[in-house]
Regions:
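Short, glycine-/small- and polar/acidic-enriched structural segments
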Residues: 29-161, 165-169, 178, 185-191, ...
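Soluble non-cytosolic domains of exported or imported proteins
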Residues: 66-70, 85, 139, 143-144, ...
Length: 331
């Protein structure tokens, strides 16, 4: 009789363990994330992946390249992706078009511009007024890089419309190749391209747009309002994983960060990744928490307005949800 009871208890325990395992397995949820471009600038996102922070939260991330703000928004609005990593200006453009299901910024990843000014010739004692009379190969009109670029030029007394020849009709993916082929005296580039050009003697980094522009919600995670309502727990878990990664990046060296994200940049030498990470850490480009505050939001709209690209002024609370980030941080 005792043997039978023991067998029953053992069987029940097995069933319980199996059920819990099955239950845990079913809780893993796939989240499709579209990134506007693939860049070391987004290091905390790759740390969240490589260090298993998303996995700890029961999330499986399907990371997709959407390449361009307009394409990223199209993918999000058409349910091709669940969450977008893109500049906050895109949410304002969508809102201004009368969207019935607005796109909400819920977790900030980068807090400065991520581009650098690269000159074709080596420049001694660089000053911004040296751009006057030059040909400047900028970024796509209406995107954050171009708007920040114009904002910084104006800040230093250089009118991008009259003081230089501004080229901004080249596709994002082709800008670096255009400069390498001989177009422009100066170009605005992301890393690691800027450092690669410097190593190869194709250009020289002379200034940082991130240092000059101040804090701005340059790249944030956003999703449709309806997705947050229907998947609030998923968004909370996602934000928690990002916050863990942000603190990890903040407390680890550039070398350690480079080693963590290297699998996502197989064609980039590890020492170059480290150089780029150090540069971004030094200028405070990586947000240390996911909260997009009102001051940053207003700075964004000032930059958009100065560039003539702000379709309508939008209050912080309309397109920004800080409740989720604040809740995660307070845990």
């Amino acid at each position: 009789m005792r043997l039978i009871k023991s067998s029953i208890v053992l069987f029940a325990t097995f069933i319980l363990i199996f059920s819990l395992a099955a239950c845990g397995k079913s809780e893993v949820q796939k989240v499709r994330v579209g990134e506007v471009t693939h860049s070391i600038f987004y290091a905390p996102q790759y740390v969240a992946l490589s260090e298993g922070f998303f996995e700890e939260e029961g999330l499986e991330i399907d990371l997709q390249g959407t390449f361009g703000g307009d394409k990223t928004m199209t993918a999000l609005l058409s349910d091709g992706i669940d969450i977008a990593l893109v500049g906050s200006e895109t949410s304002i453009y969508v809102y201004a078009q009368g969207a019935t299901d607005p796109v909400i910024n819920f977790a900030q990843l980068t807090q400065t511009d991520g581009t650098f000014l690269v000159s074709r010739e080596k420049v001694e004692n660089f000053s911004w007024d040296q751009l006057k009379g030059s040909t400047f190969l900028g970024q796509r009109k209406g995107g954050m890089p171009q708007m920040v670029g114009e904002f910084v030029l104006n800040k230093h007394g250089v009118d991008p419309q009259t003081d230089l020849e501004l080229i901004q009709n080249i596709e994002f993916a082709n800008i670096a190749n255009a400069f390498a082929s001989g177009t422009g005296d100066y170009v605005q580039l992301f890393e690691p391209t800027a450092s690669i050009f410097e190593q190869e003697g194709k250009g020289h980094i002379v200034a940082s747009f991130g240092k000059e522009s101040g804090h701005v919600p340059y790249t944030t995670f956003m999703t449709k309002e309806s997705y947050i309502k229907e998947n609030k727990e998923v968004v909370e878990k996602f934000t928690r994983a990002i916050y863990k990664a942000q603190k990890w990046v903040e407390t680890h060296s550039a070398k350690e960060v480079a080693e963590s994200i290297a699998p996502y940049f197989e064609d980039t030498p590890i020492d170059l990744i480290e150089t780029v990470v150090e540069r971004y850490k030094e200028q405070g480009s990586f947000a240390t928490d996911p909260i997009l505050d009102e001051e940053e939001w207003n700075n964004l709209q000032t930059i958009m307005d100065d560039a003539g690209e702000l379709p309508t002024d939008v209050e912080h609370g309309i397109l920004v949800n800080t409740d989720i980030a604040e809740s995660v941080i307070s845990e």
